[in-house]
């Protein structure tokens, strides 16, 4: 059995080698010739699975993507060919939410506002958007959510129209898939008209898919230099990056918002377990068994936390400025975008850290944000 695996998928070689011969390849440059004699294909979002890619894959029976997003896979084609497909919904939701929160916390410090006085507008209430909503509301931040699909499905949450959200939110964060058809297409959802309508004191964060925002229009909006702020983890034509847009962004990173070690381990184990089930193998893997101890596994608090404490704790685990600085330093080199993703550091989630304190420390909201908490006597 031959299993072709994206070389950037952590723990994959160790796990899948229990099932057959593992062949590692860079996901973005896969060709039809690479899939000759391949029984199973394990990918990430940089691999476009289409008719051209699988044209010579006569033995292919299984495709798994270790990502929450699935818009890079022609699912109808796979179904037509009798090829089983699976994804890893929700695997990276924590990492993306913590990326957004890091952007918010750093900007609050730089621009002199309190995150607790901001209204956050979340566009897209799927796995990531819903988790982010839960975290922010858990610590007392006002949230507006927009998702016409969820609303029409009968989701009982209180939804907001996109127009109202764009008017009332101080922070607008995007968490939609990329779609070009249907009732609510998201390609250039944030277009020139919308960008020009946004206030100078608003913040736009895109950690979803690059083409959700018209990058050319965003560049023109930021060139007004009126204080409007934008942070991008994804770019419209990545791995190509508009070098005129880059210096205008508050933060820029190479599509790594969901690249925390826990999230990647979850994605790998989810598709590994699906493949084991598919071939009738009883092996199963658990992400928690693969993870090392965090660099700072425990923090003791001696007083009730405040916003300064929150900033220290969250940035100790993940500070977006680290990735932003590397991105600006290295992006000019050939192949840098994918190389930064391939060599991404072992970033951890808040859950890797246990906060210890008395009942007076009021740790419960921090647990809702994702930290482990331990109330001391």
UniProtKB/Swiss-Prot annotation:
Catalytic activity: 4-phospho-D-erythronate + NAD(+) = (R)-3-hydroxy-2-oxo-4-phosphooxybutanoate + NADH + H(+)
Active site: 209, 238, 255
Gene Ontology cellular-component annotations: cytoplasm
Binding site for substrate: 45, 67, 259
Residues that coordinate or bind NAD(+): 127-128, 147, 176, 233, 258
Chief place where the protein resides: cytoplasm
BP GO terms, sorted: pyridoxine biosynthetic process
Domain of life: Bacteria
Pathway named in the protein's UniProt entry: Cofactor biosynthesis; pyridoxine 5'-phosphate biosynthesis; pyridoxine 5'-phosphate from D-erythrose 4-phosphate: step 2/5
Keyword Manganese: no
Record Pfam families: 2-Hacid_dh, 2-Hacid_dh_C, DUF3410
Cellular compartment(s): Cytoplasm
GO molecular function: 4-phosphoerythronate dehydrogenase activity; NAD binding; protein dimerization activity
Keyword NAD attached: yes
InterPro entries: D-iso_2-hydroxyacid_DH_PdxB, D-isomer_2_OHA_DH_cat_dom, D-isomer_DH_CS, D-isomer_DH_NAD-bd, Erythronate-4-P_DHase, Erythronate-4-P_DHase_dimer, NAD(P)-bd_dom_sf, PdxB_dimer_sf
Keywords, alphabetical: Cytoplasm, NAD, Oxidoreductase, Pyridoxine biosynthesis
Enzyme class, UniProt record, top EC level: oxidoreductase
Entry EC number(s): 1.1.1.290
Assembly, per entry: Homodimer.
Family affiliation: Belongs to the D-isomer specific 2-hydroxyacid dehydrogenase family. PdxB subfamily.
Function of the molecule: Catalyzes the oxidation of erythronate-4-phosphate to 3-hydroxy-2-oxo-4-phosphonooxybutanoate.
UniProt name for this protein: Erythronate-4-phosphate dehydrogenase
């Amino acid at each position: 059995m031959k299993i072709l695996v994206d070389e950037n998928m952590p723990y994959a070689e160790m796990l899948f080698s229990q099932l057959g011969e593992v062949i590692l390849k860079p996901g973005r440059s896969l060709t039809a010739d690479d899939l000759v004699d391949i029984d199973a294909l394990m990918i990430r979002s940089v691999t476009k699975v289409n008719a051209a890619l699988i044209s010579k894959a006569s033995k292919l029976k299984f495709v798994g993507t270790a990502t929450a997003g699935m818009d890079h896979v022609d699912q109808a084609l796979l179904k037509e060919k009798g090829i089983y497909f699976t994804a890893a919904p929700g695997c990276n939701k924590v990492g993306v939410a913590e990326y957004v929160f890091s952007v918010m916390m750093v900007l609050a410090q730089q621009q002199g506002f309190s995150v607790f006085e901001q209204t956050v507008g979340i566009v897209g209430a799927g796995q990531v958007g819903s988790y982010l909503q839960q975290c922010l509301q858990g610590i007392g931040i006002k949230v507006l959510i927009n998702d016409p699909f969820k609303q029409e499905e009968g989701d009982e949450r209180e939804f907001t129209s996109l127009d109202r959200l764009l008017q009332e939110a101080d922070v607008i964060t995007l968490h939609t898939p990329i779609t070009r058809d249907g009732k609510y297409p998201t390609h250039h959802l944030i277009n020139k008209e919308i960008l020009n309508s946004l206030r100078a004191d608003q913040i736009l964060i895109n950690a979803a898919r690059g083409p959700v925002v018209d990058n050319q229009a965003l560049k023109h909006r930021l060139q007004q230099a009126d204080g409007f702020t934008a942070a991008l983890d994804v770019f419209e034509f990545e791995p190509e990056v508009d070098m005129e847009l880059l210096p205008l962004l508050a933060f820029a990173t190479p599509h790594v918002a969901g690249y925390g070690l826990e999230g990647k381990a979850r994605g790998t184990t989810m598709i590994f377990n699906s493949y084991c089930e598919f071939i009738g193998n009883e092996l199963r893997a658990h992400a928690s068994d693969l993870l090392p101890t965090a660099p700072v596994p425990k923090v003791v608090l001696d007083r009730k936390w405040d916003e300064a404490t929150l900033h220290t704790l969250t940035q100790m685990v993940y500070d977006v400025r680290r990735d932003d600085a590397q991105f600006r330093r290295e992006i000019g080199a050939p192949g840098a975008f994918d190389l930064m993703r391939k060599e991404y550091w072992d970033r951890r989630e808040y859950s890797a850290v246990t906060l210890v304190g008395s009942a007076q420390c009021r740790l419960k909201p921090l647990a809702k944000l994702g930290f482990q908490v331990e109330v001391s006597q």
